[in-house]
Regions:
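Short, small-residue-biased leader/transition segments that mark boundaries at the very start
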Residues: 1-2
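Transmembrane helix-loop-helix hairpins at the membrane interface
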Residues: 7-167
Length: 169
């Protein structure tokens, strides 16, 4: 069955794709930009912007317009906050892989970048507002949840603090 094959293909290749993005943006670039600017906020915002611009060529932008770049930039910011507050990339790696896996397996549309034989298919006329909903409401709730679950402290220093060469990002 095609869905069985899709499940295993997605299970193998989507974590590779999302891990590559996370290692490049939240690993390599965030650390390199942090060393260059000697602070944490510049790499957080620059890598978020770069992450958004990487997705500029996705068909969702063509369908819904450049307003959708807000979604991608703020998703990058969300992943960056998870990485800095948790002192590691595990949460952003898992969330990114889970998000793309869900889109691939559970629901997709003719106008999305992941053209798969998913369980559900959206056939309605898309609205940018429904795609922006997660970044303005769901992501902040997830950050709040993780902050309580993992007892995140020292937000100001972790997100906006100075970097010295003996500190890690």
């Amino acid at each position: 069955c095609i869905r069985d094959r899709l499940f295993f293909i997605s299970l193998i290749f989507l974590p590779i794709q999302t891990s590559w993005e996370e290692y490049v943006f939240r690993g390599y670039l965030m650390q390199g930009i942090g060393i260059l600017f000697k602070n944490r906020w510049t790499p957080l915002f620059l890598t978020s912007l770069m992450f958004g611009l990487l997705h500029y060529w996705n068909p969702e932008i063509t369908k819904l317009g450049s307003i959708l770049l807000i979604h991608y930039v703020l998703t990058g910011l969300f992943f960056g906050i998870l990485t800095l507050m948790d002192d590691g990339m595990e949460l952003s790696l898992g969330f990114h892989a889970g998000n793309n896996f869900m889109i691939s397996i559970l629901v997709t549309a003719d106008w999305t970048v992941l053209q798969t034989d998913s369980i559900l298919k959206s056939v309605g006329d898309p609205k940018a507002g429904s795609i922006l909903l997660p970044v303005f409401f769901i992501y902040p709730l997830i950050i709040l949840y993780f902050s309580k679950k993992y007892n995140w402290k020292d937000w100001n220093n972790k997100l906006f603090g100075k970097i010295s060469l003996d500190n890690k990002i």
